[in-house]
Amino acid sequence: MKAAESYADYYKDRPESLLNLTGQTSYVDDLPLPEGTLFAVPVGAPSARGRSLQLDAREALALDPSVRVLTARDIPGENQLGYVLPDEPLIADGEWSYKGEVVALVLARDRSTARRAARLVRISGEELPPVLDAREAFARGDIIMQPLHLESGDVDRAFAEADFVVTGSCESDGQEHLYLETQAAIAIPEDGGRMYCISSTQGPTGVQKAISRVLGIPMAQVEVEARRLGGAFGGKEDQAAPWATLAALGAWYTGRPVKLVLNRAEDMVMTGKRHPYSSDFKIGLTKDGRILGFEVTYYQNSGACIDLSLAILWRTMFHVC
């Protein structure tokens, strides 16, 4: 921006600026709903890892006649969202792999009733120790693929010619995307077994594929509309698919429109983050500080499922080299 320009001049040609400034912008949570819409709230696993999952929904179902509680057994198609590896069930079945993983979906006539019912679902099972450290996972062989190697030049010669060789380790922590608009979707069943979904997503085709897979219907019968996003920063690429698919599952099961909007606490616990990394590095330098050689080993913490981890790992390596 030139020094003489004001911020108002700089943004005046952006068509959404006035709408955002005056609060007229519509997001998924602002849209008018069809009559009879149900509201969905996911129930999350209480700990980081476990098995022998058991649910008791009797209190939740007794709260209100409109309450429905869906589990993995209610999925008509495949209980799977993962495409690189089949490691991401839509709803946990028997085992769970992270705190907040969806173990059930509650539907009710309004959001308040759905949230109250979700709190009444009792969860039990055998808790297991989680693996939280990428180095530990690598040592155990618990990895998503074989290690990648990228080389350029003769690093051994560079270290031999260097005046100084420095080694060390570095930790780069995870980070929440913290988009202002949380994950949101509205699913509307249509004639002929079709499903229409409005999703706050950066990747509508991924949402379409996920709904098709879970409902067991052709992609041609699934229409996904991506509305204006209230921020995303990469957090609504593959990450938007589970919530839209859960809404679609509820709509498929009940034959009624279903709206699902995570609150902030749910969004921060239930969604993926920027990858944490551990790294060991070795740098060869001259006396005047010029880098002759650099060698680094990265340990990527990809979390409970692979998602976009491979693409992120490749990008990490390309950025270094």
Locations of the language-model features?
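Flexible, low-hydrophobicity surface segments
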Residues: 1-146, 150, 157, 165-168, ...
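Short glycine-rich loop/turn motifs
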Residues: 38, 93, 181-186, 278
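Beta-strand segments within the central parallel beta-sheet cores of soluble alpha/beta enzyme folds
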Residues: 72, 221-227, 255-265, 292-297
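Short acidic loop-to-helix transition motifs that present clustered carboxylates
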Residues: 74-78, 172, 204-205, 229-230, ...
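Helix-loop-helix junctions that connect adjacent transmembrane helices in secondary transporters/permeases
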Residues: 76, 135-215
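Gly/Pro-rich active-site capping loops and adjacent beta-alpha segments
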Residues: 10, 113-132, 207, 212, ...
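Alpha-helical support elements that line or immediately flank enzyme active sites
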Residues: 41-70, 105-124, 185-254, 300, ...
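Glycine-rich and small/hydrophobic secondary-structure elements
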Residues: 87-113, 234-285
